[in-house]
Amino acid sequence: MTKLTVAVFSYNRGAYLEFCLASLARNLPHAQVVVYDDLSDDPATQAVLAALKVPLVQPSAVARAQHGGLYVNMARALAEVETDYLLFLQDDMQIVRRVDDQDFADIAAIFDADPDCGFVSPLFMKAGIARKLHAQYQSAQGLAAYQTSPEIPRAEMRFAFADVCLAHVDRLRDAGFTVVEGEGHNEAQAREKFSQMPLMSAPFAFYCPEVPTFRNRKRPLSGQIARLRRRPEGLGYHDMTAAEVADFRARDPAIWPFAEDFLTPQNPQVRKPFVFQDFQGPLALRVLARVEYLLLSGGRRLRRLRAKLGI
């Protein structure tokens, strides 16, 4: 019986979508996979979508929110899923090792240990937020997970939800959890309804490094420049070998699963610690990206103010 549905959210990154789906076929072959595409208009991506061997869902109209139709599609996936678990995944991600019965047993044990648990993170940890993670989590005795430190009050939980996570479908529905626009709003809702999201100590998924990024469905200038200098080497990571997975599972849980310590990029020239947007490479591009963001956010604030004033 299929226990897991993987909802892959896609927009204009055809090569990455292919790469993501190939990793699912290799490493999570028994999962039900559905692609939710936000009406990609890139010809190369459209060609990938036309050749899909898994179900494709697209909206009837283009979403105008900052994140496009991501949250609308996440809500639709949650409404339509018929399996025990739902993995929210994005097209710029990879399943980096074989997922087996031991993993499903670990996941079930994590949920069984806490009836208030609605989400589990299957992701390797980002080195850039190590301090925040150490402040909020500790190794969970008897579970293949890191859980919230007991002294952390619910109001101070910072990882109740993430756009990429593994959801316990029945618990979300029983609690009346619905995906709304904005990760912060979803996290606030999750904080009210559930305990903080545990992190798997033997995760199996991660973000590809230095990926093309969109804002309001458009490539920023910094991203366009980054694309011109993009190295042609591999998009993601080498799959972990069986021996590496065995050592990974057997390690002391005091050694946290930070991606840089366990994953080997196909392109050895990617920046470390890993960055996940292509304009986060050279300093000049990072500065340009920051200026673009400030101009964009300032423009939104001005439009909201003018709307309130009726001018």
List the predicted regions and their residue ranges.
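N-proximal low-complexity "stem/linker" segments adjacent to membrane-targeting elements
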Residues: 1-22
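Short, acidic, metal-binding catalytic loop of nucleotide-sugar glycosyltransferases
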Residues: 22-31
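Conserved nucleotide-sugar donor-binding
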Residues: 82-83, 159-176
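Short aromatic/hydrophobic "clamp" motif used to bind/position activated sugar donors
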Residues: 86
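Conserved donor-nucleotide/metal-binding helix-loop-beta segment in metal-dependent transferases, i.e.
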Residues: 98-119
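C-terminal catalytic/acceptor-binding lobe
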Residues: 174-311
